[in-house]
Amino acid sequence: GYQAKRRYYDDKSMYVHNPKPELSSAENFLRLIRSDKTYTRLEAETLDLALILHAEHGGGNNSSLTVHVVSSADTDTYSAMAAAVGSLKGRRHGGANIRVVEMMDDIKANVKDWSNENEISAYIRKIAEKQAFDKSGLVYGMGHAVYTISDPREVLLKAKAKELAKAKGCMEEFNLYDTIEKVAPGIIQDVHKSDKKVCANVDFY
C-alpha cells in the first residue's frame, strides 16, 4: 500500500523488498519502506514500542471490536485485519495522530520562536478558541476519556521520542512538543471553563 501511494500520489519510483523472517515486525517495516533498506536500532525500538503500546490496549477500542465482529462472520484472518486497519484509519480512532501532525505543522508555521512559551501559549489558545488551525477548538493529542493525570503510553513514547530526537538532531522540535504538553492542559481548562484534568495522550508524540 505504501509503495502504491508513493507511485500514484507522490509520483516517485516504486521498489519492493522482501521481508526477512528473522527480523522483528518493526525492523521489517522500516526495511520495506526505505530504498536502501537501512534503519538504526533506536528507530526500530521506537517503532516496536509504538506498535506494542497501540496493540489491543484492553480490547474494547473500535478496531479491536471490528476484528471481533468481522471474525464472527467466519471470514479469514487477512480480511479481519484489513477491516481493523480500515477502522484504525478513522479520524476518531488511529487517524487522530494524523491530526496531531497536521496541527503541529500549523503551529510550527505560525509560531516564530519555538522556545518562547508565551508565544506558543498564545497560539494554542487561538486553536482552543476556534480561531486557528481547523477551527474545531480541539488541541489534538490532548485529553483522554479515561486517563486524566497521565496516559502511561504517552509517558513511555515521550521518553523514546526524546532519545530519537537527540539522535536525529531534532531537540528544538521535541522541546516545542514538550512546551505544548506543559501549557495546553491549563489553556483547555480555562477556555472550556472546566476543572477536569487534561493530559497528553498516546497520539501526541
Question: Predicted segment positions?
Answer:
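Non-transmembrane, aqueous-exposed alpha-helical and coiled segments at domain scale
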Residues: 1-205
